[in-house]
Amino acid sequence: MSTTTDLSLPPGPVVVIGAGLAGLTVALQLAAERPVIVLAKRELSESATAWAQGGIVGVLGSDDSIESHVRDTQEAGAGIVDEHTARYIAEHSAAAVQWLVDAGVSFSPDPQGPLGLHLTREGGHAVRRIAHAADATGRAIHDALLARAREHSNISIRERWMAVDLVTSRHLKREESPHCYGVYALDMDRGHVQTLAAAAVVLATGGVGKVYRYTSNPDTATGDGIAMAWRAGCRVGNMEFIQFHPTCLYHPQERSLLITEA
């Protein structure tokens, strides 16, 4: 993965809303060139990334190929998968896994495996292509990236800061093309809403699983970023596609507990 960017942005920080795998990855990429503020709605341990267990896919083995991965993805998606997106992910998957290794993620090793990693096979995959850290892959990835972000002088992480809405030209009543100037965020410990000006705002807020009664998602997965984007005038699509993990431990008085297929 490239560690350089050319966004042609005005001076100032980038605000990343979300401190999971997506948010921390983009923060680490951007921090080489400009200050980055990362907002975490709750405690950092509440990220859905840290809850993920099974592993991460990469076309790594000599018995694997881009075409095989794309074909498996399309079959698992019952033929309604966007092929361009599936192919892009498959083509960049090995580089993404290598970037995570370089970032310090402690995947389960196999001296004979590609990149020295142990690969496993899960449902829908024709070959072994799942790099994992035992059965706590999300936690291992999140811990490694969070450690790098915390030690980076250009990254500021604000825990328990909940993004309320984007600051747009509509809020400022400016007669111009739609533009985002920053974010309104609630400092949950102090009970104050702060306005953060930004050269750009990245929405990395995860999914919407917690709007349903039964889900394996953490309480933070309430679709905040999707709602903010929609209010700002962005096009929102494919909202009918919601991931439900097929196996959970159910208790009527407690959160559902994901049972990994790994």
What are these regions (language model features)?
Residues 76-118:
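Rossmann-like flavin
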Residues 2-4, 12, 69, 73, ...:
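N-terminal flexible segment immediately upstream of the FAD-binding catalytic core
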Residues 86-88, 98-105, 127-132, 172-177, ...:
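Short, charged low-complexity intrinsically disordered segments located at boundaries
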